[in-house]
Curated annotation (Swiss-Prot):
This is Protein SIP18. Disulfide bonds: none annotated. The gene is SIP18. GO terms for cellular component: cytoplasm. Present with 2300 molecules/cell in log phase SD medium. Residues 1-79 are annotated as: Disordered. GO terms for molecular function: phospholipid binding. Signal peptide: none annotated. Residues 8-20 have a biased composition (Basic and acidic residues). GO terms for biological process: cellular response to water deprivation.
């Protein structure tokens, strides 16, 4: 899972680099933003996992469906 996120982040940063050649200050700020975004995503995932384990009713299925939707979103953005 983290491998996929790394590739995704690299792709984002690669796109930004091509947009912002020669603007180093802006580029490094953008990279920091991307890192914060990744950390936020990881945080959400672990919280979701805790909720899943906590609540073993129908929530597990919903959480699984949410992950599948995220994967579809990622696949669509990759194109």
């Amino acid at each position: 899972m983290s491998n996929m996120m790394n590739k995704f982040a690299e792709k984002l940063q690669g796109n930004d680099d091509s947009h912002q050649k020669g603007k180093n200050a802006k580029s490094s700020n953008k990279e920091r933003d991307d890192m914060n975004m990744d950390m936020g995503m990881g945080h959400d995932q672990s919280e979701g996992g805790m909720k899943m384990g906590h609540d073993q009713s129908g929530t597990k299925m919903n959480a699984g469906r949410g992950i599948a939707n995220d994967w579809k979103t990622y696949e669509n953005m990759k194109k």
